Regions:
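Function-determining sites in protein domains
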Residues: 2-132
């Protein structure tokens, strides 16, 4: 009888371990990241809601933007062409549209029909420093 309890206990531990690994795998693969080819980026066009602000051609500034964008992960899907806000910045990176904005004292990067990424204030300020 005790032999059966030992087998049941080991089986329960094995099932728990398998479920934990499966859960971690599903969690890590369900996050969205921005898909782009950083090596191909020669220029980033920056727009406000109303007009074009500037072109970013500096490799250092482009690298700074790319470093921030490559870190982003999200589970929140974007279902809009652009943010429904009065103030935002639009970055045109090759064929990719990226929006940067603040809403309710939180900071976001949004890629239309892909994802909405929550960023921290220092990332937001760094992006604004580059795009303004």
């Amino acid at each position: 009888m005790s032999f059966l309890k030992i087998i049941q206990g080991k089986f329960l531990i094995l099932i728990t371990l398998i479920l934990a690994i499966l859960g971690f795998f599903l969690y890590s693969t369900s996050t969205r990241k921005i898909n782009f080819n950083p090596e191909k980026i020669a220029r980033i066009e920056v727009f406000s809601k109303e007009r074009k602000i500037k072109d970013i051609n500096s490799p250092n500034k482009i690298d700074d933007i790319v470093k921030i964008l490559k870190q982003l992960r999200s589970r929140t899907e974007s279902v809009n062409d652009f943010p429904d806000l009065e103030k935002y910045y639009w970055l045109k990176i090759e064929e990719l549209n990226v929006y940067i904005y603040e809403n309710d004292k939180k900071y976001y990067v949004e890629v239309p029909y892909n994802a909405i990424y929550l960023i921290n204030k220092s990332q937001y300020n760094k992006l604004l420093e580059i795009v303004k």
